[in-house]
Amino acid sequence: MAAETLTELEAAIETVVSTFFTFAGREGRKGSLNINEFKELATQQLPHLLKDVGSLDEKMKTLDVNQDSELRFSEYWRLIGELAKEVRKEKALGIRKK
C-alpha cells in the first residue's frame, strides 16, 4: 500500500489480514491456520467475541469448508463475517456501545 494514512476502515481491514498471517503457518502450512494456530488466534485476539461459541474445535470444523483440518483465508473470513453480524445485531439492539 502507499505511504498515505489509512482510514479507520482501511486500517481495520489491514489488521484483520495481518492478524491472520501473524498466526498462519507457525506450525502447519504457511498461509493457513491449523487447529492450534486457530485456537491461539481465537484466545489471544477474539476472547470476548468468541467467549460464547463453545468448543473451538467444533467452531473450526464448521468453518473448514473443504475439511482439510486447516483454515485458509477465505474460511477465516467467514468467521470474521459471522462475528461482524453478531456485533451489528448487538449495536441494533443497543447492547454494544462501541
Curated annotation (Swiss-Prot):
Keyword Nucleus attributed: no
Keywords for this protein: Calcium, Copper, Cytoplasm, Lipid-binding, Metal-binding, Phosphoprotein, Protein transport, Repeat, Secreted, Transport
Single biological process term from Gene Ontology: positive regulation of interleukin-1 alpha production
CDD domains hit by this protein: S-100A13 (cd05022)
InterPro entries listed in its UniProt record: EF-hand-dom_pair, S100_Ca-bd_sub
Main location per the UniProt record: cytoplasm
SUPFAM superfamilies per record: EF-hand (SSF47473)
Binding site for Ca(2+) 1: 32, 37
Residue numbers of Phosphoserine PTMs: 32
Ligand binding (Ca(2+) 2): 64, 66, 68, 70, 75
Occurrences of domain EF-hand (ranges): 18-53
Domain of life: Eukaryota
GO cellular component: collagen-containing extracellular matrix; cytosol; extracellular space
Subcellular location: Cytoplasm; Secreted
GO MF term set: calcium ion binding; copper ion binding; lipid binding
Coiled-coil ranges (or none): none
Biological role stated in the UniProt entry: Plays a role in the export of proteins that lack a signal peptide and are secreted by an alternative pathway. Binds two calcium ions per subunit. Binds one copper ion. Binding of one copper ion does not interfere with calcium binding. Required for the copper-dependent stress-induced export of IL1A and FGF1. The calcium-free protein binds to lipid vesicles containing phosphatidylserine, but not to vesicles containing phosphatidylcholine.
Known partners and oligomeric status: Homodimer. Part of a copper-dependent multiprotein complex containing S100A13, FGF1 and SYT1. Interacts with FGF1 and SYT1. Interacts with IL1A.
Protein name: Protein S100-A13
Record lineage: Eukaryota, Metazoa, Chordata, Craniata, Vertebrata
